[in-house]
Amino acid sequence: MKLDLLTAISPIDGRYRGKTDVLAAYFSEFALIKYRVQVEVEYFITLCELPLPQLKGVDKGVFETLRNIYRNFSEADAQRIKDIESVTNHDVKAVEYFLKEEFDKLGGMDDYKEFIHFGLTSQDINNTSVPLSVKEALEQVCLLYTSDAADD
């Protein structure tokens, strides 16, 4: 079935899509994947900043480049992750493999890419990504609407 008003999983994505479209940036499949990428990248950076002994050699100048992976995250990136997932049958593992590909593009990160997702479970990623999406939706959308309503 193609997605339309009659085949949407809920009225939120169906008849109310015009009113809730702004929330797609926080709660869509694309958004969840992007938040997972963000959490994995920030976790890796945190391991470098500790520093985890094996990551002492990571140049801190690469941190902004790593953050740009999620800041500039595209539909093509999300599709690449979905393609990886079709092989792995594991959504979070697909994010990890995607990030390893991105590290390969940077060069000089071969010794460090095995520390992506180091010591984490998929639930660690999901249980951080979903609340982050809720937090950002509240701050960037919901509070603005309630503030506007209070002003009226």
Locate each region found by the language model.
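A helix-coil-helix interface module used to build multimeric assemblies
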Residues: M1-S147
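A short, hydrophobic C-terminal helix/tail in secreted or cell-surface proteins
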Residues: D148-D152
